């Protein structure tokens, strides 16, 4: 799947066309008020481009939360998003109380020129995800004939399909793979994601460094194996480092995370790294806590001293910070997935914060730096570095699957150039 070969919005003739666009308006809400409008703002360039280039209408569809196929307008309606869009675009936005069916089809068939229409939450229908729950909470699967009808109804709402929701591209849902129109293009947000990930996965600049953190080795096996075929260096930190250090150095790790299942793969991973000439770097010293708690007593440890019984490693220490900085300084391309300490707590945030500072410095020296979404993106938000790295991904799960070498159904479904 060549990411760089997919049809993009700027290559589509939109004049007089109705555009149906999958966006990611899954925004945090409190009492029906939007608490962070970042995802709505991120979709504006694609919407504006359509209107500026003569599109007849832009019909927007999204999910919000996990209603599991049950209509819950009191809790998960997209209506507040319509109001937010109005103020961001300074244009009227028509909100429809459903996303499919005769009334929706009629409203979208021949709207006024330049109309912006927002559909109600796609996940109020079990046919969007293909599975959900009934009113008693029992898991159910959607009837295939009804899924087909749902997709056919969505397909009637536009002449051109645009997907600008990278965050759901790893899901084969009706709105990501089931809209059947002759032209299916990526929006600008999706294009930026695909451009950056193709830089890393198709023709990487070298030296190429992957920084992998997180808790369990077994959750990252596929990621580690795939990246070992691409990178020159790999920093392994976070909770999963303790499984490696116990297996490889027989280090005493106290009550630190140990992943029994992941431990069985360590030897195979190291053999692959050696065969591919990849240098893997582990922490050599640690900041420890006497419990998993923000107010834990804080201690220090090294590989030689080990971590005492009952204590756990929650961050890397000053020596490791220095080593990480030296590796980062050599790289021309960096992909970072997963923090290397419990960054939410100040006592155990130094390792991740120091690494972030080095990655920012590398970016200003011309290194391309890509932050996989999820927790690492949260680190960027916490320390205000979103604009100081090359790219912060908007999709945690989607970016992880790409880096694991998987094909994303929502990208696969787009037209080729």
From Swiss-Prot:
Gene Ontology molecular function: any one: phosphoglycerate kinase activity
Keyword Ribonucleoprotein: no
CC cofactor: Mg(2+)
Modified residues (Phosphotyrosine): 196
Location of Phosphoserine modifications: 4
Family classification: Belongs to the phosphoglycerate kinase family.
Protein name in UniProt: Phosphoglycerate kinase 2
Species annotation: Mus musculus
Name of the coding gene: Pgk2
């Amino acid at each position: 799947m060549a990411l760089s070969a997919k049809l993009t919005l700027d290559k589509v003739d939109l004049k007089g066309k109705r555009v149906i666009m999958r966006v990611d308006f899954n925004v945090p809400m409190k009492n029906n008020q939007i608490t962070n409008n970042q995802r709505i703002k991120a979709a504006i360039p694609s919407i504006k481009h359509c209107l500026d280039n003569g599109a007849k209408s832009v019909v927007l569809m999204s999910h919000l939360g996990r209603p599991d196929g049950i209509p819950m307008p009191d809790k998960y309606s997209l209506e507040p998003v319509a109001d937010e869009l109005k103020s961001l675009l300074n244009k009227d936005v028509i909100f429809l109380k459903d996303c499919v069916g005769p009334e929706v089809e009629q409203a979208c068939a021949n709207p006024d020129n330049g109309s912006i229409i927002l559909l109600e939450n796609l996940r109020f229908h079990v046919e969007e995800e293909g599975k959900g729950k009934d009113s008693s909470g029992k898991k159910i699967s959607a009837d295939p004939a009804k899924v087909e009808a749902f997709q056919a109804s969505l397909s009637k709402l536009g002449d051109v399909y645009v997907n600008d929701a990278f965050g759901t591209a790893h899901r084969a849902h009706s709105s990501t793979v089931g809209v059947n129109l002759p032209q299916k293009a990526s929006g600008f947000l999706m294009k930026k994601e695909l451009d950056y990930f193709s830089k890393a996965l198709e023709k990487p600049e070298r030296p190429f460094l992957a920084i992998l953190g997180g808790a369990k080795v077994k959750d990252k096996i596929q990621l580690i194996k795939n990246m070992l075929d691409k990178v020159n260096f790999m920093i392994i930190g976070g909770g999963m480092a303790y499984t490696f250090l116990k297996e490889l150095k027989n280090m005493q790790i106290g009550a630190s995370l140990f992943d029994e299942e992941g431990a069985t793969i360590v030897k195979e991973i190291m053999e692959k790294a050696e065969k591919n000439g990849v240098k893997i770097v582990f922490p050599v010293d640690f900041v420890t806590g006497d419990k998993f708690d923000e107010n834990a007593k804080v201690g220090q440890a090294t590989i030689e001293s080990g971590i005492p019984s009952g204590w756990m490693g929650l961050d890397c220490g000053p020596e490791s910070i220095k080593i990480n900085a030296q590796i980062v300084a050599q790289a021309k391309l960096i992909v970072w997935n997963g923090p290397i300490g419990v960054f939410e707590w100040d006592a155990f945030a130094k390792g991740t914060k120091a690494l972030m500072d080095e990655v920012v410095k590398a970016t200003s020296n011309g290194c391309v730096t890509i932050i996989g979404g999820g927790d690492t993106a949260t680190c960027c938000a916490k320390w205000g570095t979103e604009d100081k790295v090359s790219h912060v991904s908007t999709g945690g799960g989607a970016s992880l699957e790409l880096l694991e070498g998987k094909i994303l159904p929502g990208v696969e479904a787009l037209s080729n150039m």
